[in-house]
Structure formats: C-alpha cells, structure tokens
C-alpha cells in the first residue's frame, strides 16, 4: 500500500505541474465496495492519469506485453491485471471479477486498446461480462487531452492540458435480470458496453462511437 501511495503522490504532482491536471467527479467513486471504473483509452498516459485522479486504490486491466522485467514486477505490486489480447483471456477477466467481488476497485478500458485518432471507439463485450458476473456499479470516466499529450506512435510527450471527469455510477442490475438466459448473454454484454461508452461520450461532450459510425457512413 505504501508503494501505491508514493506512486499516486508522485504522478499527481507531476501531472498537475506538467499537464495542469483537472479532476472532477471523484465523489462518484464509492469509497468501499466492489466497483468497476470504465474509461476511454487514447494514450499510454491514461493509466497513471486516471489512477492519480481516484481517492482509492484500484487495479488496472492492461495488455500482457505492456510491461516486462522489473517494470512488470512493479506494476503487479501496484495492482496491474495483465490481459492477453490475442484471445479472450478468461484468467485475466476472472481475476478482475474476483477482486471486485472481494470489494476492490478495478479499471477497464472497454475499447480494448488505444484509439489511434483520439475519438471514442466501440466498446467490446468484456466489460459487460464483468458487470453481469459481479452485479457491481460502473463509474464511467472520460480522459481528455491525453491523446494530444502522447498519441500512439509519438516519441515524446507534449505539454497539453489534461482533464479527468468521473460520472455517476451506472446500475445494470435491472438489465441483467431482464436479459437473463444463455441465448441473450452476448447481446447483454454488448448492450452494457454500448451504454457505458455512450455515458463516457456524454461526460466528454464528444460523439459516441455509434453516432460517429453513423456519421461516417453518410
């Protein structure tokens, strides 16, 4: 826990000085109890920035090859949950479910990877699977400015303003009950994911993935 606190304070200080970090809506994150925080993903900065915006320790789901060697050891001690991207990683998702059921906070990026252009991408069904398995509330979060500061492929960080906005918890218990049954499971997962991405878009005042896709097709 001490390591996490030191890392949190360091990142918060650096982000405030370099990126003029602004955080709002932290009060929406429950102080205790299992919860899933779902955010958009457009930069390698998203993990540390989102983490230092929360007032409780959280475990972050991230791809397996993101860290190696000593860095991987450090991140595991900070709560990282490695996920294999080439296939559905039941082990990684089961670990996230276990931590939430144990009363922990877990962070997921529903898009499954960084957005190349900074715009929101359609969410994948994995987030829906976690919600259906745990019945936990979902706190949506929008990260603005991280793509401008460090987009995919960039060789250096640019000093751009960054903001993090957390929204009110989303409760999917009624939807899960309504769509109970094996035949509706995939549809349920995708619908949960879509609704979460829509709320993230609203927090950022940007187009939701479904709206953007329809606009591109016209």
Where are each of the predicted segments found?
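Transmembrane alpha-helical segments that form the membrane-embedded catalytic/substrate-channel core
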Residues: 14-17, 199
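Active-site phosphate/pyrophosphate- and oxyanion-stabilizing loops and adjacent acidic/basic residues
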Residues: 12, 48, 128-129
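Short gly/ser/thr-rich secondary-structure transition/capping motifs
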Residues: 16-24, 146-148
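Non-catalytic C-terminal accessory region of glycerolipid acyltransferases
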Residues: 2, 91-218
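Conserved beta-strand scaffold positions in the cores of enzyme catalytic domains, especially
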Residues: 23, 60, 80-82, 138, ...
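Compositionally biased, charge-rich terminal segments
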Residues: 1-2, 64
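Catalytic core of membrane glycerolipid acyltransferases/transacylases, capturing the structured
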Residues: 7-8, 16-17, 29-88, 95
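A short N-terminal beta-strand-loop micro-motif at the entrance of redox/enzyme domains
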Residues: 23, 28, 167-169
């Amino acid at each position: 826990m001490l390591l996490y606190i030191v890392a949190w304070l360091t990142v918060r200080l650096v982000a405030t000085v370099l990126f003029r970090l602004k955080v709002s809506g932290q009060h929406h994150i429950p102080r205790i109890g299992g919860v899933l925080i779902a955010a958009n993903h457009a930069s390698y900065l998203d993990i540390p920035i989102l983490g230092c915006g929360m007032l409780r320790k959280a475990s972050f789901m991230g791809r397996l090859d993101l860290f190696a060697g000593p860095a991987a050891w450090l991140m595991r001690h900070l709560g990282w949950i490695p996920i294999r991207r080439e296939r559905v990683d039941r082990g990684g998702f089961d670990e996230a479910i276990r931590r939430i059921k144990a009363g922990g906070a877990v962070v997921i990026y529903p898009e499954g990877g960084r957005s190349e252009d900074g715009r929101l991408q359609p969410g994948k069904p994995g987030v829906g699977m976690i919600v259906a398995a745990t019945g936990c509330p979902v706190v949506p979060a929008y990260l603005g400015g991280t793509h401008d500061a460090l987009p995919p492929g960039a060789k250096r960080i640019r000093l751009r303003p960054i903001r993090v906005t957390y929204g009110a918890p989303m409760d999917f218990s009624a939807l899960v009950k309504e769509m109970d049954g094996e035949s509706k499971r995939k549809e349920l997962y995708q619908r949960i994911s879509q609704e979460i991405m829509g709320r993230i878009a609203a927090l950022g005042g940007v187009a939701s993935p479904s709206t953007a896709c329809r606009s591109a097709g016209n």
